[in-house]
Amino acid sequence: MRIILLGAPGAGKGTQAQFIMEKYGIPQISTGDMLRAAVKAGTELGKQAKEIMDAGKLVTDELVIALVKERIAQDDCRNGFLLDGFPRTIPQADAMKDVGINVDYVIEFAVPDELIIDRIVGRRVHAASGRVYHVKFNPPKVEGKDDVTGEDLTIRKDDHEDTVRKRLVEYHQQTAPLVSYYQKEADAGNTRYFKVEGTRKVEEVRAELETILG
């Protein structure tokens, strides 16, 4: 079961990815984690990636694809994998296909931008424990304070409204075209494409995913 999750940041992919991993026993492959692991392990590809990153440059698509290919050949991917945050662009999707990385399911999480902004900008975090609150959807007992320790809650740098809006613009320019790309792939019988309304309750989205994935 090889799955790609598509959707803007804050569309709820992370929550559902956790559920899919646990239910179906497949690992989530995040390109960021994968790059860090390869650099730490000192593999040939990891050394190349480190050189590029140390120079302050972006790692090339070719190198990321090679890392993905190496990663999915590992034992824990025998039953499949879940790709998170990759591919981000059509050239990356094409490159994946060219090296024989096929996917069974592409699931798009559809959520309007304004709701995403609402979701992300309202987040508050207790840095020491990682506990996450939301001023509207999951408020702490005392405003601005962690329920357990009473310590101050903070706003992550990425959760400021101007940053979120920039990320959404980037998503619509770069990643949204993958929606029509994978719809065409599904029409050609190369994958199965599903659109999930991410505005609903977590449990409702989860139930739909179970129906889709079986």
From Swiss-Prot:
Alphabetical list of PROSITE patterns matching this protein: ADENYLATE_KINASE
Functional note: Catalyzes the reversible transfer of the terminal phosphate group between ATP and AMP. Plays an important role in cellular energy homeostasis and in adenine nucleotide metabolism.
Pfam families: ADK, ADK_lid
Family assignment from sequence similarity: Belongs to the adenylate kinase family.
GO cellular component entries: cytoplasm
Entry text on domains: Consists of three domains, a large central CORE domain and two small peripheral domains, NMPbind and LID, which undergo movements during catalysis. The LID domain closes over the site of phosphoryl transfer upon ATP binding. Assembling and dissambling the active center during each catalytic cycle provides an effective means to prevent ATP hydrolysis.
Name listed for the protein in its UniProt record: Adenylate kinase
Residues the entry annotates as binding AMP: T31, R36, K57, L58, V59, G85, F86, P87, R88, Q92, R156, R167
EC number(s) stated in the UniProt entry for this protein: 2.7.4.3
Known partners and oligomeric status: Monomer.
The organism of origin for this protein: Pectobacterium carotovorum subsp. carotovorum (strain PC1)
